[in-house]
């Protein structure tokens, strides 16, 4: 680990010199690339330097104990040694985590697809609750959201809604939301007070560049139609809505939120590109050992990941067995406690995996 950290620090120093060089700065694309590399390792290097400083201080204190010093000073030094020894261990643990392989998509924007599942109108209302929860979470993170397409019901639910979340590290946190979300509550239409169970599925897809996924124009069919609102009534007098069908895979994407057909086509192509990327990734990962399917953050949308129990005010994340009792705050976007727990669990799995590899 130390050799790798030394190499990273050396690389960081080289990059620091380069990004300060006027001749490099003249080439903006190259300079931005180097700045990105520099920022990616900066936190590791700063933490490594704190670790080295703690080790140096620890050695200095141990050296002091070897000399003849008075009892009071000796007691102070011994106490400081205990604190520094703990700091060194903590730094080593933090550095191990920081050196874990990163998901290449973590820094990307995301598309989030929410669909009402079993439960009819109640499931559609729950899908709307999840949409609000994620938009509130995005606000807390300083991210921006943009609706790509929505199929709204007459009473304010969503049969399906697709939206984009733009912001640094959006995928790194939102990816843990992929899966089936289950809700247990008494619907407003239920006169007997009986608890109903409904579900909604969430898929989180990283935004992909044109270079990541190439789409042959001959492989798509584009249909245009008039945008419709609640109950199917027409809300536009021009054919501005767009439906794109990818013929080889049968994937269909619709977008009607914009007034201009060209804008709807651009949005639909972005979503199609993300879905094709997800499909390619799923096929690529199909050969990976079965045990990896059970890991945290596998992103399997068929997996039941979380239950929202309204009568008890409870949220349970089944992947890590975490239960918290603050349903109202959670649905208002205060979801970091669960996401942080999922990140920690995934890091622990990666550490274990690396340990097994070494064996």
Curated annotation (Swiss-Prot):
CC terms in the record's Gene Ontology section: cytoplasm
Pfam entry (one): RF-1
Top-level taxonomic group: Bacteria
SMART domains referenced in this protein's UniProt entry, alphabetically: PCRF
Post-translational modification: Methylated by PrmC. Methylation increases the termination efficiency of RF1.
InterPro entries: PCRF, Pep_chain_release_fac_I, Pep_chain_release_fac_I_sf, Prokaryotic/Mito_RF, RF-1
Family: Belongs to the prokaryotic/mitochondrial release factor family.
Protein name as it appears in the record: Peptide chain release factor 1
């Amino acid at each position: 680990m130390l050799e790798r950290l030394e190499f990273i620090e050396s690389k960081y120093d080289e990059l620091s010199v380069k990004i300060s060089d006027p001749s490099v700065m003249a080439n903006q694309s190259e300079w931005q690339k180097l700045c990105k590399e520099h920022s990616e390792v900066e936190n590791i290097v700063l933490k490594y330097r704190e670790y080295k400083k703690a080790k140096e201080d620890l050695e200095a204190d141990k050296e002091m104990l070897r000399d003849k010093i008075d009892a009071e000073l000796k007691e102070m030094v011994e106490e400081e040694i205990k604190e520094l020894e703990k700091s060194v261990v903590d730094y080593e643990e933090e550095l191990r985590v920081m050196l874990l392989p990163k998901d290449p998509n973590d820094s990307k924007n995301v598309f989030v697809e929410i669909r009402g599942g079993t439960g009819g109108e109640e499931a559609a209302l729950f899908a709307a609750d999840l949409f609000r929860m994620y938009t509130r979470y995005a606000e807390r993170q300083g991210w921006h959201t943009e609706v790509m397409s929505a199929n709204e019901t007459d009473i304010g639910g969503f049969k399906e809604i697709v939206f984009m979340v733009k912001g640094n590290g959006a995928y790194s946190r939102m990816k843990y939301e992929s899966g089936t979300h289950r809700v247990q509550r008494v619907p407003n239409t239920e006169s007997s007070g009986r608890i109903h169970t409904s579900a909604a599925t969430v898929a989180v897809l990283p935004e992909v560049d044109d270079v990541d996924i190439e789409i042959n124009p001959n492989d798509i069919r584009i249909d245009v139609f008039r945008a419709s609102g609640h109950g199917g009534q027409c809300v536009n007098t021009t054919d501005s809505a767009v439906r794109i069908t990818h013929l080889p895979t049968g994937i269909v994407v619709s977008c009607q939120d914009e007034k201009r057909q060209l804008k709807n086509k651009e949005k639909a192509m972005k979503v199609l590109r993300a879905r094709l990327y997800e499909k390619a990734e799923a096929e690529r990962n199909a050969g990976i050992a079965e045990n990896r399917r059970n890991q945290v953050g596998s992103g399997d949308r068929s997996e039941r990941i979380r239950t929202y129990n309204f009568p008890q005010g409870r949220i349970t994340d089944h992947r890590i067995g975490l239960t918290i009792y603050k349903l109202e705050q959670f649905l208002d976007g205060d979801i970091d406690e669960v996401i942080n727990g999922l990140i920690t669990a995934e890091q622990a799995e990666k550490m274990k995996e690396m340990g097994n590899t070494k064996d």
